[in-house]
Amino acid sequence: MKKDLFALKGTICYSKNQKELVFHENSYVVCENSLCAGIFSQLPAEYKDIPVEDMGDQLIIPGFTDLHLHAPQYAYRGTGMDLELLDWLNTITFPQEAKYADLSYAKKAYSIFVDDLKHSFTTRACIFATLHRPATELLMDMLEESGLTTMVGKVNMDRNGAPELQEKSAQASAQDTRQWLEEI
């Protein structure tokens, strides 16, 4: 038996295309190595000994993929909604993101972010961090340990930001990114 192999039983719902939903009532979805191995009205003999969690009449739906997520912004989500973008960046975002230079702050904030993400419907995500390499690497490690499938990008900023969030030059930023890529 494979290590990451289980089934969920219930009403399975997914979109066949942009206009059509498919429902399989009282059925099984077999998950193998984090992928759907199939949907079955009866559990096939080859899967008879795997763990099955009966979800009753709850809907079983695919996980969500978030293609644009700023991890450091999670700590202050919902604030400054009345501000224009540049005002929001200058008064809220830049001062908050500067805090990620402190690894102890980054660890606390990213722990909350990763834990909440893990307990959400999001199963895959493309995530922006900050320009702080150590904090970005910390976030990557935490997400890898979480079991979520993610990609994390280090932010590069050499202009139009707060002084504490700007790299010295585009060349220095590119060099820092190359070094970061070599190390990960």
What kind of feature is each model-predicted range?
Residues 123-124:
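Short acidic/polar active-site loop segments enriched in Thr and Asp
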Residues 116-120, 145:
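Alpha-helix C-terminal capping segments
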Residues 129-133:
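Divalent-metal (often Zn2+) His-rich catalytic cores of metallo-beta-lactamase-fold enzymes
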Residues 1-47:
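N-terminal metal-binding scaffold of metallo-dependent hydrolase/deaminase domains
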Residues 134-184:
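Metal-coordinating catalytic core of metallo-dependent amide/deamination hydrolases
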Residues 77-106, 159-170:
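Active-site gating loops and adjacent loop-to-helix segments of metal-dependent hydrolytic enzymes
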Residues 102-115, 136, 170-177:
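Short, acidic/polar
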